[in-house]
Amino acid sequence: NKVFVAKRIDNPKNFWQMPQGGVDEGEDFLTAAYRELEEETSIKKVEIIKEIDGTITYELPDHLLGIIWKGKYKGQKQKWFIMRFLGNDEEINIKTNKPEFLEWKWIDLDKLTEVVVDFKLHVYKELKEKIKKIIN
């Protein structure tokens, strides 16, 4: 039960996250998930295990408002998909055209909430519990 996490370039502290991103106009959630995964990690070979029901929302802390996303947004409403990676680790490349990550690793699902930034902790707690119910 390993999950992919990566350390963001814009946060030099030891905080990790799973790939995520926005939905372009006219794009559905699943298409956006595939696109963001490939843009951030070069990963193409995946299968969908399950779409997580509902959305999970977080807001940026006050000290980051106006800094992150050029002040355009104050948080995110996220739609998550559980995917199984079907490729080899050698296919993973975070040195993309617009790199977002410094490094990546596989971690145990149970460790997920130990490595994320505080303001996203509730997102990853909820996500971890939903994933556990689906894969067990």
Identify what each model region corresponds to.
Residues D24-D118, H122:
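Unchanged
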Residues N14-M18, L102-E103, E126:
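A short, polar/proline- and glycine-enriched secondary-structure boundary/capping micro-motif
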Residues E129-N136:
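Generic C-terminal helix-cap and adjacent flexible tail
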